[in-house]
């Protein structure tokens, strides 16, 4: 378990929203919708199974769940399999979620990113892919970098991951340096635990006005750690359902597949 001090250090790394916007006239989304919204959930948490997925299912929406291998427990496997069968995406969040040492108690050494090298990280991503395939039957998966960073032993592993063919797309953190959206380093804007439904809806509206893409990231929903309240999550989901005629809500890989096939949607943040 992370300590309170650790939670404060990672703060904004737990409830994230990714906002990518360019000029509205340059964007085209399915059905003439004005923006695309992706809902993602990290760490294979019980509250995602118990609260988030039922809320999404009730609204007819599909999300992406980035699972950590060592967080999976046998009694939950069938529930994750059922979620995938219902159209939710299962994504790769590595086996051990190696983050920088600064995010963990001093005694935790073995599964920090400093203790890894690039081959070790790619081997772990490959292993997690196999675990996911055993659950959902799919041969390709997207990836979310642990703690929003992509370092192993101080070396950026994205260049090697990019050419490895192991994952289709990567959700990271921070703004990219270029003007074109990089599907292997999708940028992120993070919000803290106090984010409300109104905060999230305002971000959606900003994306809609600019014709952009908003990727929303959660950890706990109404429980677990670094959580957003179930009420705030429900408000966002209700808003997305009510505006389905103007907002396209789909899993991460589905939206990124669309972006990849529509060059006019590949502009980076404005």
Model-based region annotation:
Residues 1-6:
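N-terminal secretory signal peptides that target proteins for export/translocation
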């Amino acid at each position: 378990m992370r300590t309170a001090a650790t939670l404060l250090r990672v703060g904004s790394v737990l409830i994230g929203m990714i906002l990518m916007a360019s000029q509205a006239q340059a964007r085209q989304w399915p059905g003439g919708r004005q923006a695309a919204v992706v809902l993602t959930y990290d760490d294979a948490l019980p509250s995602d199974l118990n609260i988030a997925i039922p809320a999404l299912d009730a609204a007819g929406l599909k999300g992406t769940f980035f699972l950590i291998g060592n967080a999976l427990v046998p009694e939950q496997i069938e529930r994750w399999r059922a979620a995938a069968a219902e159209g939710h995406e299962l994504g790769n969040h590595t086996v051990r979620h190696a983050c920088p040492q600064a995010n963990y108690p001093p005694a935790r050494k073995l599964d920090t990113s400093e203790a890894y090298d690039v081959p070790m990280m790619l081997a772990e991503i490959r292993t997690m892919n196999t675990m996911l395939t055993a659950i959902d039957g799919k041969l390709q998966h997207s990836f979310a970098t642990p703690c929003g960073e992509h370092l192993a032993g101080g070396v950026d592993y994205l260049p090697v991951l990019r050419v490895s063919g192991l994952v289709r797309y990567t959700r990271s953190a921070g703004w990219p340096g270029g003007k074109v959206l990089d599907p292997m380093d999708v940028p992120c804007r993070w919000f803290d635990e106090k984010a409300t439904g109104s905060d999230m809806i305002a971000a959606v509206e900003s994306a809609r006005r600019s014709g952009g893409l908003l990727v929303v990231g959660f950890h706990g929903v109404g429980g677990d750690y670094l959580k957003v309240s179930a009420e705030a999550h429900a408000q966002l989901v209700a808003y997305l359902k009510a505006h389905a005629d103007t907002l396209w809500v789909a899993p991460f890989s589905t939206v990124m597949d669309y972006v990849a096939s529509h060059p006019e949607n590949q502009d980076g943040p404005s």
